[in-house]
Amino acid sequence: MGKKVAIIGAGVSGLASIRSCLEEGLEPTCFEKSNDIGGLWKFSDHAEEGRASIYKSVFTNSSKEMMCFPDFPYPDDFPNFMHNSKIQEYLTAFAKEKSLLKYIQFKTFVSSVNKRPDFATTGQWDVTTERDGKRESAVFDAVMVCSGHHVYPNLPKESFPGLNHFKGKCFHSRDYKEPGVFKGKRVLVVGLGNSGCDIATELSHTAEQVVISSRSGSWVMSRVWDNGYPWDMVLITRFGTFLKNNLPTAISDWLYMKQMNARFKHENYGLMPLNGVLRKEPVFNDELPACILCGIVSVKPNVKKFTETSAIFEDGTTFEGIDCVIFATGYSYTYTFLDESIIKNRNNEIILFKGVFPPLLEKSTIAVIGFVQSLGAAIPTVDLQSRWAARVIKGTCTLPSMEDMMNDINEKMERKHKWYGKSETLQTDYIVYMDELSSFIGVKPNIPWLFLTDPKLAMEVYFGPCSPYQFRLVGPGKWPGARNAILTQWDRSLKPLQTRVVGRLQKPCFFFHWLKPFAIPILLIAVFLGLT
């Protein structure tokens, strides 16, 4: 076998990393704190220290055709947006199919990862683990950090004057599991992210009253998009990305605002982001607008201060008789087992080349997998990250110099601040990022060549959904079934809907979807020219 690689965590990122190491002839050992795979997607009735935690009703925000491993589609009958138990079922099937379980040491806690004294020449690491009260250390040639960034809750109590006097319950959203215990209660949810909106809408059916407090607002999107298709299969396309990144800023901003307000006017619902043209990651919630319309959820600005039983908001209004405050305020980015000098933090910005490699080490033998966010799905992202990292560790791919990596990081961060704002340092442009990683590995689809040699496939690749299968079409790790998977992705998407067949299946034409916003301006210009 090849170099020994320690993989920390057996969630989505960890499984992808084990598989990528095996593809490159490396020797992986995965350490998992719990007794099962799945990470974030493994539901537990109670939140465990040092592990990601989800509530019982969590569903995916990405559809199944956009969030699979590129050579392992979901079963045809799986719904497009899946309950967490379905994801766990899929990950278990993937791990068994790829024979990954034998490389995982369960119930093993990684307490420290340190450079060896000769790191500058060997790039090796001392990894210390604990299991059943026993402490062990081992030497590894490389480390892949796959422990996620939804572990340590951010609970900024000091930002809310008077909270220490509040007499009701107060906790972070990671401790929320199900709505039954809140029957008849008055609940304040602080934070307008995915968790905050999910919890608020779920509680609205059992609680007496639910209020969401938001400091800066958010775009709220539905999973169901034009003509009832999954949102990401309509919007995440290469053609759409080309338009977004090449149109004049004013037109691009107009298109973005029109897209975000397609379902309802955010201003009317008190949800409009403070800076609407920033491409901050939207919230996905199909119920929130209806809950606001029905009066069972209200949206308020930031909390100015708390009293013993109420919250006073920045607009002077008050929510009285609060029984419980749930802080859906995100997570802190930290790796307790690593020295701070290894993965540096600058103004809430983790310094990593392409979101994976610390740029200032003598040897690039540690990689962070899964530490980016985008409108795209996590599984195909970590698949590409881990494939690239494994090839760098093996020596097949090389990284630029420290100076070039830092210049790239600084340039990308300036662009991120422009597009997403300074608070969204993990955010990235999905297709642009995936194409960068795939070009490093040699698996990026050659679109012009596809149009010449396989126009049917090229049309689907460029104008259709940028699905994960595209990154197993060519190059290392090529999957023979990738072409067919792309051409049949709509069939699998529509299959679970056909429980009552009433006509021929209708597949969308996405070229016209992107031209639709320009139809009225073009028509008006034509009328004007005709009149003159």
Curated annotation (Swiss-Prot):
FAD binds at residues 9-13, 32, 40-41, 61-62. This is Flavin-containing monooxygenase 3. Keywords: Endoplasmic reticulum, FAD, Flavoprotein, Membrane, Microsome, Monooxygenase, NADP, Oxidoreductase, Phosphoprotein, Transmembrane, Transmembrane helix. NADP(+) binds at residues 60-61, 195-198. The keyword Phosphoprotein applies. It is found in: Microsome membrane; Endoplasmic reticulum membrane. The chain crosses the membrane at residues 510-530. Liver. Its EC number is 1.14.13.148, 1.14.13.32, 1.14.13.8. Its cofactor is FAD. It comes from Macaca mulatta (Rhesus macaque). It is an enzyme of class 1 (oxidoreductase). The gene is FMO3. InterPro entries: FAD/NAD-bd_sf, Flavin_mOase, Flavin_mOase-like, Flavin_mOase_3, FMO-like. Gene3D superfamilies: FAD/NAD(P)-binding domain. GO terms for cellular component: endoplasmic reticulum membrane. It catalyses: trimethylamine + NADPH + O2 = trimethylamine N-oxide + NADP(+) + H2O; N,N-dimethylaniline + NADPH + O2 + H(+) = N,N-dimethylaniline N-oxide + NADP(+) + H2O; hypotaurine + NADPH + O2 + H(+) = taurine + NADP(+) + H2O; (S)-nicotine + NADPH + O2 = trans-(S)-nicotine N(1')-oxide + NADP(+) + H2O. It comes from the Eukaryota. The modification Phosphoserine is found at residue 401. It is a single-pass membrane protein.
